[in-house]
């Protein structure tokens, strides 16, 4: 048996290790299964070649594996020999417990669990699980899927990608029961991390469809897996998969997950997924249109990354935090031009910094280049939430926190230029810049020749590094003092990199109204835009701008006239309200739903205006939805205000009923009692499509209003409100 041989080899290595290291040796080297030398045991290296493990950590890992491997060997042996369903279940449960306990070990849990997961694969346990996933007994499939989800480390994902994707996809097609769906969604969550090719295969074969279908469910664990599966799919699938996700309306289905009022982890994972999608310029507009992106920054601003980190540590499947590959994907978000991506990326990295500092593994952040990206956000970001999170992450990692760069670069004095040079690592040239009296204006107009001849930067590679930093500074700078036509934001809307050309253009006296008259040669010689492709794109967009009006208040009227206004009680109706929004959007309706991002002082006006503008008023009647309206004779409750406005404006009111108990008419204020004369539709989570079709008929045909409580005009299945 392979596991027996490996365990014997491990014991032999352990014996020689205890004899003491060779003089001068400061790391333990043990041959791996491929018989090549390595810097750690096979169970710690995970079969990916050798790596260094500190002696202290190595001893802890060795001790834990010495206790766990014999038990795992025995459990796997019994599982292979089991024939009855009950015996198979007992064997799966025992292996699952061993793996789960390993993941929960503080500090060394990842290495110990990695060793057990590798042992399961090497002894044929992974292949056995794939066979058990095809067993006729539902309970066996559920337990096997639950264990497989726990052991999908990188090498095991490789194996499943080669021989087991079909099995996983067949399970995904079942969709039910929820116990099986939880684990299958968790398996897909891990497999979406495997590679871009695997993501494409899973999406093409229905894996993404299954996850999106489960997004309409109510089980918290299932929804968390769905949110992370979509995030991993977006992070690792590449632009082709991201385009497919948007076409399948993933951004819309993420809305109810990000809108949840009960599960902060779920909301964060959903916000991560939609923020990643928004970084793809090809689909950015569609993602914005979904409305989900607007939830990201307010959510992140309201949460504490330390508390989030504790939640991750307390859960068995996230107790070790993210691995280096996952962290690398998050670093890419920091470098995005989208505020939402920077914000959510900084939050996750701050939480991961807290976890890694507890584990003593903060070096990984330097290895993946996260430190520089975090420092750049502190220096340049104008968003207070993002900057604060980046500062906190740097402090947790024991790094120096840089000073924030003043955004009005054109107004910098010589001292500010000196500070900037020091922060970007060019301190050796400070004296040269001081002698030449370089201020912000000169810095923004600096040329390669001047940098070489006048400022003494001889190395062409060093100059390239400098201009890379200068381009970043120009991109983040504020030009409000000299850019009267807001040329910077217009350039940024074409491509975030184009903001670097703002100062060169405005210094020549150009604004948006004159840009179309400029020649390509003038852009090159007078404005310093050296890249021909960039010149062509800017001129093309400037000439197109002549045929389209500049943004103005009047131009937003159509976007502020929704087909449907959804009124709901936050503490009990938010999930159903968000589901209704998605379903109606997918059927072509424009929908307004309050997402708690209205400007301070304008909350009431915005809500009332939206009710007045909407053609239909959908009232979500969840448990206790009207309780606060009772005795609210001053009309201070928001749901009360919305209902009264809808009634006074003669809106088509469509009540949706979910766990709602009817109040007596006299219990409600007189100004809203008329709402009880409308027919309601009972919501069915099991038959959502059928319920939505009925709602659409109500929206299109206005059959819900009923002047008498006993009217016979109610549709089949509709409930006349106010009647027993």
Swiss-Prot record:
Residues 36-45 have a biased composition (Low complexity). Phosphorylation at Ser-548 by JNK kinases (MAPK8, MAPK9 and /or MAPK10) enhance the NAD(+) hydrolase (NADase) activity. Phosphorylation at Ser-548 and subsequent activation takes place in response to oxidative stress conditions and inhibits mitochondrial respiration. It comes from the Eukaryota. Belongs to the SARM1 family. GO terms for cellular component: axon; cell surface; cytoplasm; dendrite; extrinsic component of synaptic membrane; glutamatergic synapse; microtubule; microtubule cytoskeleton. It comes from Mus musculus (Mouse). Induction: Down-regulated in sciatic nerve of mice with diabetic peripheral neuropathy (at protein level). PROSITE patterns: SAM_DOMAIN, TIR. This is NAD(+) hydrolase SARM1. ARM repeats lie at residues 60-100, 114-153, 155-193, 196-235, 237-280, 281-314, 315-354, 359-402. Autoinhibited: in the inactive state, the enzymatic TIR domain is held apart by the autoinhibiting ARM repeats. NAD(+)-binding to ARM repeats maintains an inactive state by promoting interaction between ARM repeats and the TIR domain, thereby facilitating inhibition of the enzymatic TIR domain. Following activation, possibly by nicotinamide mononucleotide (NMN), auto-inhibitory interactions are released, allowing self-association of the TIR domains and subsequent activation of the NAD(+) hydrolase (NADase) activity. Self-association of TIR domains is facilitated by the octamer of SAM domains. Its main location: cytoplasm. Its EC number is 3.2.2.6, 3.2.2.-. NAD(+) hydrolase, which plays a key role in axonal degeneration following injury by regulating NAD(+) metabolism. Acts as a negative regulator of MYD88- and TRIF-dependent toll-like receptor signaling pathway by promoting Wallerian degeneration, an injury-induced form of programmed subcellular death which involves degeneration of an axon distal to the injury site. The active site is at 642. NAD(+) 1 binds at residues 103, 110, 149-157, 190-193.
